[in-house]
Amino acid sequence: MTSLRFVITATLLGSTIGAPAHAHAAAQWKTDFDKHTVPLDEITSGGPPKDGIPAVDRPVFVSVAEADEWLGDREPVVVVAYGGETKAYPLQILIWHEIVNDEIAGLPVSVTFCPLCNTALAFDRRFDGRVLDFGTTGKLRHSDLVMYDRQTETWWQQASGEGIVGTYAGRRLTLVSAPLVSWKQFQQEYPEGLVLSRQTGFSRDYGRNPYQRYDTRKGPFDHFFSGRKDGRLPAMERVVALAEADSSVAYSMSALEDRPVLNDTFSGRPIVVLWAPGTASALDASAIADGRDVGSTGVFGREIGGRVLTFESAGPGLYRDAQTGSTWNVFGRATSGPLAGQRLDPVPHGNHFWFAWAVFMPHTRVES
């Protein structure tokens, strides 16, 4: 339970844990350090050793009713829906483990969260004809989690899904849609869903935020961030972040709070970006359930049945399309009207801190 606190305490005390991570790494790694796509001196130690922040490899799930005994209505959860199954991964657990290796309806996935970057992302673990299992290296690059796969010990940048050191350097993992929403929203939308339980095999103070007030800072810890800060937005602004091929875009979440629907075109595809109130920041108050409201987001293709829909707000957490007058929710489901029951196709996205998106996607388009 002390490993995460050590990261923060060491940083604040100005320790030397920001030293190059590869300097003494060879003995504990089978990684090919001669193969890399980034300068090795950009990778620094975050404090904990290899697997010092332990991934959850044997996740246990409970019902919505059971999880409701220990989850607050506004607590953030990562949602993965695939093949008729839906699971919620509470940030109160991910904040202590950062990686959950799981399978949903036969699809091997890794659900990940880097608290220092607010990056909650899920990846398809099928890669190059095998299934990868991921762990934490104990390293950071530009303040972001560097993961490794246990099959080749390639190091992967969590915020981008890119292999940066080792066998798969230069290759990318495939994102799986994993929106970050409130527990109450998940309960209402998926009452029969499953929830990652606190039965992780580890003793942690689940529900407590070890990064208290982190997201009220003006920027990331200097020890862990050596990149250029992009002044187009405040460093700790949350953005809805999308990338595909050579295109990327970031939508300011504070702007979405004022205008909760944005119709756009990304990479040639008509999309809609939705924002809804009611989700707590996991990186604010000491108790995650008490964090300030930062909202939840959904991103979807807005073409259905061969026609492109245009959306507008229909009240907090509700949206209406101009073509049919159907009402939709933040999960992209029509709740009433001619299209009731239909769902829009989700577009994988993250709710990154701006500094963490801009440093990896410096040419990104910004909508603020």
Each language-model region and where it sits:
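Positively charged n-region of N-terminal signal peptides that target proteins for export
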Residues: M1-R5
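Bacterial N-terminal signal peptides
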Residues: V7-T16
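Mid-to-C-terminal functional-domain signal that highlights helix-capping/loop sites
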Residues: H22-S368
